Amino acid sequence: MSKEPDRLFAQPLAQVPDFAFNEDVVRVFPDMIKRSVPGYPTIVENLGVLAAQFAQPNSVLYDLGSSLGAVTQALRRHVRTDGCRVIAVDNSAAMVERCREYLNGQDSMFQELLPVQVIEGDILALEFQPASVVALNFTLQFIAPEQRLALLGRIRQSLLPGGALILSEKLRFNDDQEHALLTDLHIAFKRANGYSELEIAQKRSAIENVMKPDSLEEHRERLLAAGFSKVVPWFQCLNFASLIALP
């Protein structure tokens, strides 16, 4: 993957545009997400491990909002269930193009990986096939809040008995003191990873209108309303968490 450092917000901008997954972001995305999301490598690799426990023969594994395909690669590293295939979906043409390049590279290094199809498209319009695993890895937070329940309901309808949705998200907290503390600790994490105060402030300004986090309680209530029977948090680092939702 690209080793280009994230310097997108290093210089003062007269007007900070809304964050978008364009070619500029794609170029630096691996560095950006590693330095911005505490626990990201652990979540991604273990998502593959978890998926291997739920994958069922002759079913689809979905990576929704696949970006550069890190989750898809983890699924292919860990899942060995007969007849499974991965469908990765993202609405950014730049992300999809680079994702395909990285997956071709994975194919050249390893044999007997799950077949994969990468689709450029809107996950809200996707016609789901019977699935045993669906991954939403830091994707739902970019979906309009009023559209989230319907999407989760459609995912629930597509899941086979014994399957799972694995949902990773940035969290907000209903307790003001808890929210302030974890926000400050997240900023400290970014400082420790080399981001300046200017970069942190401009990135926050760029993303606050396009990313709308929910609380853990909101996630749980929505997943149950969508028809899931059980919601199990399996990972949290600061204000980032991952959940398993069972049909």
From Swiss-Prot:
Annotated NCBIfam families: carboxy-S-adenosyl-L-methionine synthase CmoA (TIGR00740), PRK15451.1 (NF011995)
Function: Catalyzes the conversion of S-adenosyl-L-methionine (SAM) to carboxy-S-adenosyl-L-methionine (Cx-SAM).
Record note on quaternary structure: Homodimer.
Protein family (similarity comment): Belongs to the class I-like SAM-binding methyltransferase superfamily. Cx-SAM synthase family.
Sequence positions that bind S-adenosyl-L-methionine: Y40, G65, S66, S67, D90, N91, D122, I123, N137, R204
EC category: transferase
Keywords, sorted A to Z: S-adenosyl-L-methionine, Transferase
GO BP field: tRNA wobble uridine modification
A Gene Ontology molecular function term of the record: carboxyl- or carbamoyltransferase activity
Signal sequence region: none
Pfam families from the UniProt entry: Methyltransf_25 (PF13649)
InterPro entries noted in UniProt: CmoA, Methyltransf_25, SAM-dependent_MTases_sf
Source organism phylogeny: Bacteria, Pseudomonadati, Pseudomonadota, Gammaproteobacteria, Pseudomonadales
Chain coiled-coil ranges: none
EC number(s) recorded for this UniProt protein: 2.1.3.-
Catalytic activity: prephenate + S-adenosyl-L-methionine = carboxy-S-adenosyl-L-methionine + 3-phenylpyruvate + H2O
HAMAP family xrefs: Cx_SAM_synthase (MF_01589)
Protein name stated in the entry: Carboxy-S-adenosyl-L-methionine synthase
Organism annotation: Pseudomonas fluorescens (strain ATCC BAA-477 / NRRL B-23932 / Pf-5)
